[in-house]
């Protein structure tokens, strides 16, 4: 199946717009507190259900939800929210819809989530972030499996790849059971960072799958073809169907952009990748990119 991340342009442009990423600045949280966070979280879950229903009606089976689904969740327990019971009821409807329609729902915490950081404070904050993403999936009643993944990057080597890998593994051990069971790690888009084979070696013995990012592999190929790298990553998923990311460089489509920048709409997704993985299309066109790829694939 094919999917897109976070924003749905079709629904965002409606009145009122549908979106599940309502957030607030720190100053607003300090002023309005948990009550306002609860209000936003309830709205986000309600709109997540509407987005998932739209996806199902439009045969889009894969969706990455925003990491601001519950704003400022690092500052409170989910069950402490004033609207917790209402949020839980909507979350359960979201999970039931996902399961009924055979859909796949994942998360991708922000760039600052660094489980292998050389800062103990950053590692602790990152563990907390992955844990509360898992709490949201638990609230929806979705299985503790990388099928409903929480995807991260190791993101740096801090001058010592082996020590970073060890810190990452230690942080994985500190995760809650629900977070640890859903964690996935993807290859990076900078030559000096983490490639697929390096991740496979670093994660050996952790049961954490490696998620293959097609475009990122361009920058960290380590002499492997795209298929060879995917095979190495796919072997870490066990019985679970792998997830993968696909994007095309904006430069390929005529944009004056850095090599890592994504095109608004890719031309296509390789047939072999679609056959062997659920593919998240990372593109500014969001759901429209999925439709374009699907139309290109089915055209005579």
Which stretches of residues belong to each language-model region?
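Catalytic beta/alpha-barrel core
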Residues: 151, 182-189, 211-214, 282
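Glycine-rich phosphate-binding "P-loop"
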Residues: 148-163, 255-260
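Active-site glycine-rich loop that binds ribose-phosphate moieties when present
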Residues: 132, 159-174, 189-194
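Long, repeat-rich segments with strong aromatic
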Residues: 198-222
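Alpha/beta catalytic barrel-like cores
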Residues: 1-104, 113-142, 146, 174, ...
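Extended, charged catalytic domains and RNA/DNA-binding interfaces, predominantly
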Residues: 149, 156-160, 169, 182, ...
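Short, small-residue-enriched loops and turns at beta-alpha junctions
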Residues: 112-114, 156-160, 190-192, 218-219, ...
